[in-house]
Amino acid sequence: MKITNFTKSFLLYEIIVGMFLTLKYFFKSKVTIRYPNEVSKLSPRFKGEHALRRYPDGEERCIACKLCEAICPAQAITIEAKEQPNGSRRTTKYDIDMTKCIYCGLCQEACPVDAIVEGPNLEFATETHQELLYNKEKLLRNGDMWEHVIAKNLKVDSIYR
């Protein structure tokens, strides 16, 4: 047994095996995509930039139940609510600190009316920290911009909910 181990270490057996493995994959077709020019298809469950949705009549979906704020493990969501004259509650402030967010999707799962969702946008880099502090208006704009894709993804995913 010692002679076998000595022979393997003398002939650098592990390095040779590793080089053959490298050569094997070197000549296979590449699986990498060239990202900015080529974009892969996103899953309907992709968790990207947050958005607040509206009903088709334009009314905000959020009922200020604060379940998303309570369930957020990173404590990235801050909500302030006010009761309306008709008895319903609406948010006066809905902020998400995207620098704290871990994109777990628990806020989306907790929402009883599908108001807060993580949309399909994965390219939302910014130049300043302040731009990553999303307020209600920014979230509603995101929802309006991506509503057609978000609605389709939620419909596809509805069989699993």
From Swiss-Prot:
- UniProt GO BP: aerobic respiration
User: What's its membrane topology?
Assistant: Peripheral membrane protein
This protein's GO cellular component annotations are:
plasma membrane
| Keywords noted in UniProt | 4Fe-4S, Cell inner membrane, Cell membrane, Iron, Iron-sulfur, Membrane, Metal-binding, NAD, Quinone, Repeat, Translocase, Ubiquinone
Reaction(s) catalysed by this chain, per the record, are:
a quinone + NADH + 5 H(+)(in) = a quinol + NAD(+) + 4 H(+)(out)
Q: Does the keyword Cell membrane apply?
A: yes
**Protein's name in the database:** NADH-quinone oxidoreductase subunit I
Species of the source: Orientia tsutsugamushi (strain Boryong) (Rickettsia tsutsugamushi)
Encoding gene per record: nuoI
